[in-house]
Amino acid sequence: MLVSLGGVLLCLSEMRKGNLKRLRFVFLALFATWLIGRLLFPAAIQAFVVKPNERERERPFLVHNIIFTRYAYNLDKVRIRYHPGEPMPSVSELKFHRTALANIRLWDIDQLLDAFSQLQSLHLQYGFSAVDYDRYYIGGRLRQVAIAPRELFLPNQIATWVNRHLHYTHGYGIVMSLVTEFTGEGSPSFIIKDIPPQVAEIFPYRIRRPEIYFGEFVLPEERRRRQPFVRGRQQQQPAQPQTSPTQTGQGTQSQSNQPPPPPTPEDQQPQATQTSQYTIADFVLVRTRAPEFDYPLRGELGRGEGDEGHSGWKETRYEADAGVPIGSWWRRLLFAARFMDLGLLLNTDITPESRLLMYRRILERVNAVAPFLLIDRDPYPVITSDGRIVWIVDTFTATTNFPYSTPISPQIRVNYLRNAVKVTVDAYTGEMRFYAFDPQDPMLKTYMKAFPTLFRNREEMPPDIKAHIRYPQSLFAVQATMMCLYHMTNPDQFYLKEDAWEIAQEQSGVEGKPVPIRPYYTVIRSPDDGRDRFMLLIPFTPYGKPDKNMVAWMAAHCDYDRYGDLFVYKFPPGKLVDGPQQIEARINADAQISQYFSLWNQQGSRVIRGSLLILPVGNSLLYVEPVYLQAEQTPLPEIKRVIVSAGKRVVMGEDLWDALTQLFQTPIHDGILTPNQQFHRRTPTTGHPSPVANPEAVMELLRHLQDAKQAREQGDWLRFGEALNKAFEQAEKLERAFGVAR
């Protein structure tokens, strides 16, 4: 720097003197300095100093990189535990995990989206942007569900100006189904369906405000290529995280084995979106003279009595005070210029009471208020206790300038990420509320000082919203990818990659090609506190060996009281636990299953293999994979079979319970024994004293339970699993001796 500055000053001095000969020597000296300082000297240091002693020279930089990267992605708060990895769960463990079994997800998002679109669109103007997973207490039990709002997609052939902005203003209703159940035809088992919404009696809420004026509105062409984040005006968009680690140190980055995502355009003012089939209006006008169509009436045409429809539609009138008043000519002129739309000036249906609703896409809406936040592209709807539909949007604080931290990918330089804020957006009014979920985040602290009235404390979130918060999949995927390398904190081990991991792979879809497993939501009995919880999971295999055994799995808590708690459960050294590819190979090698697949593929239909779910059940793992059948001409997938594996066995049943019954050779339903196989007492045989009469048998059971409790409190999960197994065995002995039959 000083040499360059001196050279510039010397050049200016010689130019003033007119000494061009000496000026040439100055330029040559500057070039030689650049050549030696920027190219030759660093290369020589690398070749003769660093390379022969690379590990020693890199160690201090690796230490900094490990510490700062773990902090930047919150990996320093990940707690390491051990999972026993036993080959086969016992029937007693199945009983203990009955809620988890009753919530095993059989419906994948892609198949559900196709099924919902075929069965529940119900009208030309309606469609589904996405399907999301959530949980509700239904019939007094925790149940995982799939939920999708029915949004408005206006076909181009009827997308006149009046239809776009005055008549068709909103979507209508919610579709919800249980993720574990399906009908006899293999279709989803609906909890909420149809128009007007038909809600099952066991569901605790009724939908009293089904209109959706503010939603995702993702066109069908955009569904398959959505990326995990939306950037603000000055932020970059992280790519889909890589699934394999490479050497990372000071001055190097992790490399992705996937192509970079298509670039996201800079934030723009909202505008009408049009494709070859559909149009989504940039704004709508409410409280006008024109009828606002609410939903189609079946079997009725023409105008009925009162507000019962226009041309077969029920009419409605917007009741909220949201939107911008647009009754005056002056405002109409300004907004006509704003949207470059003369219709706002020329239309005669606008009245002094009329209002304009804009920024109707919730991601654009949130970004317009907080462009400094990175926005997750997977918002999801929640049904509140008063029957409203509210969107939850995850947002992040992010920067590209965190020292020593490794960026997400070479193309995207974001190297600090926090799920600091959650935003709720009312689907009817568009009202937004920003809740600070990580008030200790330094970046969020700065934003809260700059905008003191924008953010609320997380405690202010209503209870019926708190019950449905989720840990974002996009952040968890990034953290899991980083964890593949950064679970190693020893710089020498890190340098050698002695224990590098990668995201496990599965075979899914029609072609069955290996693809990385996506993080998946599920209900499990949490190993760390023994409670049934909604969690996010992902498995790991050794780096470069996706077809080998699993080495660990990672979990994130979603429930409010444990939100953001991260765990990695490693398997004991030398313990061989089947990885997903090994299970897939076992499925492919099963003669009976292969015969069924071949038969179905020859009948004008195609077999689609669902996602392989790996679920911890007690000290073991349970592997579940649904099988769909879809006609070649109709995109309506149906669940045909369910494959379950544990230990070295693979079975295929007509449903989950049939498969579990085959696997464990015990009648099982809903996670417990079938009703006709419930326990019942019988009189013990005389002459053989029952252990119940012997206090030592009961004391032994209590000792095992106490040992398990102490092990859990100390975080010794290997001892916890062993003690719990002994307690189950002793309990089974007591059951048999007491005269309990199954």
List each language-model region with its residue ranges.
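Soluble extracytoplasmic regions of secretory-pathway and membrane proteins
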Residues: M1-Q714, L718-V740
